C-alpha cells in the first residue's frame, strides 16, 4: 500500500476500519458456545462493558491508556470492539488454536451475523450489540478480519510484501475502520478536494494506522513467532538482504539483519506517516487519544533500534515514564495539527 493506496487484492473487500498482544489469555476469550435460540446472556449492558474494560486493561495496556482519553461512550465501544477482535484472534492464535478448523470460523462468522442482528450469545456479545445500536459500524471489516484468521490457518510464510499487506489489512487495517466509525469525523474540518461540499472520511489513513501497528507487532515479535514456526517478514525481503530462514531460526543479529530491520522499520514508519494525515479529520475529542496511541506504538520502533535490533530475546516496549511523557506531546499535536 504505497502512499496510502489500497492494494488491488484487498480493494475488493474494502468496506464503505494491533493491539492484540501475545500475553496469556483469560478464559473468557476461549469460550465459543454453540448457537442456542433459548440461551440468554446473564450480564447487563454495564456488566458486559466492564468485562470488556477489564480484558482491555489487562492485555492491551498501551492501547488501554489511549482509550482512557476518549469520552465514556466511545471508550466503551472501543473496548467492546477490542474484545471481539481479541476473541477472533484467539481462534487461530490461542491455546486452543489446534482445534480450530474452517468450520469453526464459519460458525464464528454466523455468530457475528447474529450480533449484528441484535442476538448476543454470551456476556461479551452484549456490549458489542449495544455498541452497534449506538454507532454506525459496518459488518464488512469484521468479516474481513475473520478472513485474515483464515489466512493464518493455512499460511506460516509470506513470499512478498503485497501478500503480507493484504494480511495486515485484514487483521489490523480493519480495526482502523471499525474504530473510525466510533471516533467519528469533524464535519466542519476539511473536505475532499475533488468534492468541496463533501466531508472527508479518512478511511485510507485509518487502514494505514492499523497496518502500521501490525507491522510493528511483527517486528517486535519476530523471535516469538519463529518459535511457533511462523515467519511474517516477507521472504523476498530476506532474500534481498541475503538473510536466510535458517539465520532467522538461529537468531543471527549481524549487519545483514540490522539492514533488513532498518528497511522494515522505515516501511512501518511510512504507514504511520500516512496515518497521521488522517487524524486532523477526526472529531476533536478523538484526536488526542489517537495521537497518543500512534505515538506509543510508533515508540516501539525506537526501542527496537535502541536494542540494536535484538528482537530474538529482548522484547521491545515503551517504559511507563516515557509513555507519560507522550501524553502532553500528543495533546499539543491534537490542538495544532
From Swiss-Prot:
- Describe how the cofactor binds: ATP is required for the transferase activity but it does not seem to be hydrolyzed during the reaction.
Q: Which InterPro entries match?
A: Isoprenoid_synthase_dom_sf, PhytoSynCyanob, Squ/phyt_synthse, Squalene/phytoene_synthase_CS, Trans_IPPS_bact-type, Trans_IPPS_HH
GO-annotated molecular function: 15-cis-phytoene synthase activity; geranylgeranyl diphosphate synthase activity; metal ion binding; squalene synthase [NAD(P)H] activity
Q: Which Pfam families match?
A: SQS_PSY
| Obligatory cofactor(s) | ATP; Mn(2+); Mg(2+)
CDD domains listed in its UniProt record: Trans_IPPS_HH
| GO BP term, example | carotenoid biosynthetic process
Keyword terms of this UniProt record: Carotenoid biosynthesis, Magnesium, Manganese, Metal-binding, Transferase
* Reactions the enzyme catalyzes: 2 (2E,6E,10E)-geranylgeranyl diphosphate = 15-cis-phytoene + 2 diphosphate
Q: Does the keyword RNA-binding apply?
A: no
EC code(s) of this entry: 2.5.1.32
Q: In which pathway does it act?
A: Carotenoid biosynthesis; phytoene biosynthesis
Does the keyword section mention Acetylation?
no
Q: Family per UniProt?
A: Belongs to the phytoene/squalene synthase family.
Function, as annotated, reads: Involved in the biosynthesis of carotenoids. Catalyzes the condensation of two molecules of geranylgeranyl diphosphate (GGPP) to give prephytoene diphosphate (PPPP) and the subsequent rearrangement of the cyclopropylcarbinyl intermediate to yield 15-cis-phytoene.
Q: What is the protein name for this chain?
A: 15-cis-phytoene synthase
From which organism does this entry originate? Answer: Synechocystis sp. (strain ATCC 27184 / PCC 6803 / Kazusa)
Amino acid at each position: 500500500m504505497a502512499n496510502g493506496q489500497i492494494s488491488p487484492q484487498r480493494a475488493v473487500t474494502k468496506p464503505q476500519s494491533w493491539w492484540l498482544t501475545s500475553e496469556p489469555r483469560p478464559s473468557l476469550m476461549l469460550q465459543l458456545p454453540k448457537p442456542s435460540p433459548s440461551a440468554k446472556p446473564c450480564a447487563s449492558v454495564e456488566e458486559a462493558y466492564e468485562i470488556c474494560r477489564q480484558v482491555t486493561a489487562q492485555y492491551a495496556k498501551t492501547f488501554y491508556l489511549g482509550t482512557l482519553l476518549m469520552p465514556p461512550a466511545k471508550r466503551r465501544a472501543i473496548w467492546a470492539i477490542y474484545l471481539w477482535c481479541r476473541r477472533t484472534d484467539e481462534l487461530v492464535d490461542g491455546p486452543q488454536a489446534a482445534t480450530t478448523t474452517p468450520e469453526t470460523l464459519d460458525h464464528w462468522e454466523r455468530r457475528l451475523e447474529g450480533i449484528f442482528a441484535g442476538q448476543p450469545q454470551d456476556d461479551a456479545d452484549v456490549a458489542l450489540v449495544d455498541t452497534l445500536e449506538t454507532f454506525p459500524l459496518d459488518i464488512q471489516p469484521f468479516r474481513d478480519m475473520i478472513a485474515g484468521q483464515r489466512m493464518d490457518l493455512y499460511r506460516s510464510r509470506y513470499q512478498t510484501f503485497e501478500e503480507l499487506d493484504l494480511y495486515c489489512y485484514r487483521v489490523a487495517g480493519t480495526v482502523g475502520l471499525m474504530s473510525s466509525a466510533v471516533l467519528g469525523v469533524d464535519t466542519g474540518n476539511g473536505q475532499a478536494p475533488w468534492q468541496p461540499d463533501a466531508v472527508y472520511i479518512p478511511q485510507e489513513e485509518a487502514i494505514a494506522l492499523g497496518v502500521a501497528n501490525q507491522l510493528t507487532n511483527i517486528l517486535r515479535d519476530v523471535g516469538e513467532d519463529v518459535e511457533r514456526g511462523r515467519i511474517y517478514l516477507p521472504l523476498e525481503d530476506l532474500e534481498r538482504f541475503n538473510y536466510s530462514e535458517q539465520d532467522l531460526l538461529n537468531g543471527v543479529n549481524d549487519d545483514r539483519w540490522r539492514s533488513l530491520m532498518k528497511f522494515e522499520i522505515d516501511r512501518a514508519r511510512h504507514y504511520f506517516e500516512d496515518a497521521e494525515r488522517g487524524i486532523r479529520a477526526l472529531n476533536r475529542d478523538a484526536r488526542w487519544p489517537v495521537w497518543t496511541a500512534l505515538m506509543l506504538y510508533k515508540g516501539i520502533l525506537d526501542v527496537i533500534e535502541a536494542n540494536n535490533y535484538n528482537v530474538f530475546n529482548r522484547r521491545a516496549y515503551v517504559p511507563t515514564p516515557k509513555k507519560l511523557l507522550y501524553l502532553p506531546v500528543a495533546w499539543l499535536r491534537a490542538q495544532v495539527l
